[in-house]
Amino acid sequence: MQLVTPEGKAVYPHLNEADTDFDEDGNFSTKLAIPSEHAGDLLGKLEEFAEESYKTQCKEQKKQKLKRYNHPWEEEYDKDGQATGNILFKFKMRAKTRQGVDLRPVLVDAKKNPMTDRVGSGSKIKVAFEARGWFVPSLGAGVSLRLRGVQVIELVEYSAGTSATSLGFEEEDGFESEELPSKKSKETLVREEDKSLADADF
């Protein structure tokens, strides 16, 4: 089942370069936070698909019941454990086929023009994806959301560092280091972004 999400905010996207931390072939991925009031229609379709997929897997495995694997969507909570009011969806795409052919998601701007800008967390995006059912004996029956493409409505460019300005600091009279870095490095406090983590019809 192929769908396009409503607009939401990208969370820890790996859309320009594949993440190879846990897979040498790499994966493209993003989480998408969608306000609950806008996610209802999508959730309904996915829940219905998941139930039909589960029944199919039970039939194929000749079982009345199978263990169910967690869905790749859930309520989002902040660092204090409070509900944000968003539903968090998880999308993934392998960077290579089993035959070694390179894959990557389609990236387009709001006008559907191809783009290469680095998409960072907080960008407002829509995701084109394919929902697929699967079964693995050790895990059970589940559903995956296979990333196909992303439309960027509002870009927040990825940055590997955090600037002094973005942290809210202002220039003050007082101590000044004798070992002044270049303007570029002065403005950037290195902090790597947390890595926890076919055409699209937009």
Residue ranges with predicted function:
Residues 98, 134-136, 159:
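Eukaryotic short linear interaction motifs
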Residues 30, 127, 145-148:
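Hydrophobic residues positioned within well-ordered beta-strands of beta-sheet architectures
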Residues 106-125, 134-143:
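Exposed beta-sheet edge/beta-hairpin loop segments within beta-rich domains
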Residues 1-96:
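OB-fold ssDNA-binding interfaces and closely related basic DNA-contact patches used
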Residues 157-202:
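Acidic, gly/ser/pro-rich intrinsically disordered tails
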Residues 137-157:
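OB-fold/S1-family single-stranded nucleic acid-binding modules
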Residues 91-107:
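Short, basic/aromatic beta-hairpin or loop at an interaction surface
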